[in-house]
A protein has these predicted regions:
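Alpha-helical transmembrane segments and their immediate juxtamembrane cytosolic regions
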Residues: 2-319
Length: 319
């Protein structure tokens, strides 16, 4: 084992250090995710997907597919860095309330932006239907996911903080298995409920259960970041680990595409959101793999990169 490497302690409960101030690289990573969403949605909304040539989709909608996965991963990372070490403290109820108030704020802006998105194209009755969760919009739905997640994630943070590593990894595996099983159910024909929980192919929204594993992976990365970020050698190892994992996942996507016999078709399928709702293997390998690579680059750049890309960092700090 290389020097300074610590063996994994599968049964030990985490003893997390308190954060040493705001980590600008996290804001930068979130800002990159939001920036990619803006590029993707601007083309969809202003140009229209039908008006974009097939291979015009690849540099725009193919490469921007990292955005939602990066946003969700950074959500978990930020919670770990800012809140996880405080879950056993006396002021945890106040911190939890802060997250819930943030959920209300995000939910308000989600609904306000939903009206703005739908107003030019839909009659009032359909907009009201969307406001009452009778249907979903498109471009603002990541905010709807974010608002709901901010309600339940604070409830499980104390349990997560007390769980040994094997329990946390088992939880991620169990949620993936639960998602696969729930995807096979019809939910009594209630497509909206299915979409909110595990995604539905006819609705452009992120399921809370189907995307929960990414939040929890973000928590694990956030724990590692707390231990590594302010030690240059450890941070370098973390960056290389994330970069390698991301590259392997993207390579896995291309291996599947090559095995299918038509790599360009596989790339166009991802660009056209095939496998996004509900999550499919190829899409998730590419999206999460790319997100991990972008995250690694943001962490490698650290405060200097955050300062050089200040507009993105500012966007990420306010999200």
């Amino acid at each position: 084992m290389p020097p300074n490497w610590s063996p994994l302690k599968w049964t030990e409960k985490p003893q997390l250090p308190k954060g040493e101030g705001r980590i600008a690289a996290i804001d930068l990573a979130r800002g990159i995710a939001i920036g990619l969403m803006i590029v993707s949605h601007s083309v969809s909304g202003l140009v229209g997907i039908r008006n974009v040539p097939d291979w015009g989709m690849v540099p725009i909608h193919f490469l921007t597919k990292f955005s939602s996965s990066l946003f969700i991963l950074v959500f978990g990372i930020a919670l770990a860095v800012a809140f996880l070490s405080y879950t056993q403290s006396d002021d945890w109820p106040k911190r939890r309330l802060k997250l819930w108030l943030r959920a209300v704020e995000v939910w308000f802006w989600y609904k306000a932006l939903l009206v703005i998105e739908m107003l030019p194209f839909y009659p009032p009755n359909e907009i009201v239907d969307a406001l009452l969760y009778g249907r979903f919009a498109i471009w603002v739905e990541i905010l709807g996911f974010y608002a709901i997640a901010l309600l339940w994630v604070p409830l499980m943070l104390p349990l997560w903080a007390r769980a040994p590593l094997w329990g946390r990894l088992a939880t991620i595996g169990a949620l993936i298995a639960l998602t696969i099983w729930l995807q096979s159910l019809t939910f009594g024909g209630n497509d909206i409920l299915k979409a909110l929980l595990v995604d539905h192919e006819d609705h452009y929204t992120w399921g809370q259960i189907s995307r929960a594993p990414m939040i929890l992976v973000g928590l694990l990365i956030g724990e590692a970041l707390l231990r590594c970020y302010f030690d240059s050698a450890k941070r370098r190892r973390l960056v290389l680990t994330l970069l390698s994992l991301g590259a392997l996942m993207v390579a896995g996507f291309y291996a599947l595409a090559f095995a299918s016999g038509d790599v360009p078709a596989a790339m166009l399928a991802v660009a056209n959101n095939v496998g996004k709702h509900p999550p499919g293997l190829g899409f998730m390998l590419f999206s999460v793999g790319g997100a991990l690579m972008l995250l690694a680059l943001a962490l490698a750049g650290g405060a200097k990169a955050a300062k050089a890309l200040l507009p993105l960092t500012m966007v990420g700090s306010d999200a």
